[in-house]
Amino acid sequence: MLNTPGKQEYTPQLISRRGEAIAWITALLAIIGWSILMVSGRAVSPAVPFLAVFLIFSGMAISLGNWMDRRTVLVIGEDGLEFRNGLRRINISWQDISEVRVNPSQWGKKVQVYGQRTYFSFRTLSEVKVQNEIKGRFGFEQGDDILRQIILHSGLEIVERQGEGYYYARK
């Protein structure tokens, strides 16, 4: 979290890039295998090119997600919020926030902030555990505090429960 006069800047925890590397390595191995089969004149099952293309798209999707995570910033200011993630830049005043939905899950809370013409979402901190050992963390470490500040500054009140989730809106 970075603080400047009148603003608090938050960035999410970053997940390991190991999954991205594995996706690209398996895509490369599939392409190499496909190429070897083609060059040697052997019959290539239709599943091989499908698998190679699927792995390439998987690598691209994971890379895009990691790129966006590394550029994600949420700024809480006196006049409202700013959310950036590399692809989008959203500025929303406190008065323009019409609703905040909170959906608890095994991976932390997913918080969705709705304005008159815009929307963004973020996750509170989540820990990935394997055999009770923390293997990774993602989401905003101060996510619960960010949610509390959004609710207080925007003047929203809890409205009703939606299954396991709940939301805040103006009454």
Regions found by a protein language model. Give the residues of each.
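N-terminal membrane-targeting/pre-transmembrane regions
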Residues: 1-42, 162-171
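Alpha-helical transmembrane segments
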Residues: 29-33, 57-62
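Hydrophobic alpha-helical transmembrane segments
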Residues: 42-55
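Conserved beta-hairpin
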Residues: 60-99
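Hydrophobic residues embedded in beta-strands of well-ordered beta-sheets
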Residues: 81, 107-109, 165-166
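Acidic, Ser/Thr-rich low-complexity segments on the non-lumenal side of membrane proteins
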Residues: 88-123
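A membrane-cytosol interface segment of integral membrane proteins
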Residues: 112-171
